[in-house]
Amino acid sequence: MKFGVLVFPGSNCDHDAYWTVQQVARQPVTFLWHEAHDLENCDAIIVPGGFAYGDYLRTGAIAKFSPVMASVKKFADAGGLVLGICNGFQILCEAGLLPGALMRNVGLKYICKPVQVRVETTDTPFTNACRQGEVLTIPIGHMEGNYFCDPSTLAELQRDSRIVFRYSAPDGRITPGANPNGSLDNIAGICSPGRNVLGMMPHPERAAEPELGGTDGFKVFQSLVGTMVAR
């Protein structure tokens, strides 16, 4: 099993993801530079958070043209596991691997704080170590986390159980007050039709060790490793 962590100019959570995979999950991992075409036989790809290309034009709008993203798309189309975190989620949407877009937060301010998200489905390679309806506490840190899509896409996401995480109150209720950024239907994370690509705004790598204040985020990595072992 081997993980690959993409590195774009402006990425700043790549080392956090690398550390979590190598030091916490105890799995082999390598960095993959944005100009690379070869994914080096990785079994799972992480598109990390940060500010790829300075977030110029739009978040992820330039990163989607990086050579490595063409390889990631082929990898995903073949069933490869891809996890996009924060800016990585934005990049996956821009690249067409996930539907919709991430817009400016409704308050037009950068938000950095722990939030609660409810696990809406465990039928993904990223959440099979969780319980249905489980509430996880995971930090966010973004300016453009306001997920939006057209009504037909939202209906499709709901119908196919592709909304993986939703912002919730600590008791699991989905309320407007639990929504930190105005995201449509309190969406915090969605998956692809094949369920092998996940984009999420919260940072699971920032909640993977007790020293960081919690380990709820590690369940995403635990799920991935378990899936890869079973394959």
Regions found by a protein language model. Give the residues of each.
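Amide-donor transfer/coupling interface in amidating biosynthetic enzymes
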Residues: K73-D77, N105-R231
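Short, flexible active-site-adjacent loop segments at beta-strand->alpha-helix junctions, enriched
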Residues: G88-F89, D123
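N-terminal beta1-alpha1 cap of cysteine-dependent amidohydrolase-like domains
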Residues: M1-I85, C93-P99, M103-I111, R118, ...
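Glycine-rich nucleotide phosphate-binding loop and flanking beta-alpha elements
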Residues: A52-Y53, F89-I91, N146-Y147, D171
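Active-site metal-binding loops of divalent metal-dependent hydrolases
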Residues: G50-F51, G88, M143, P204
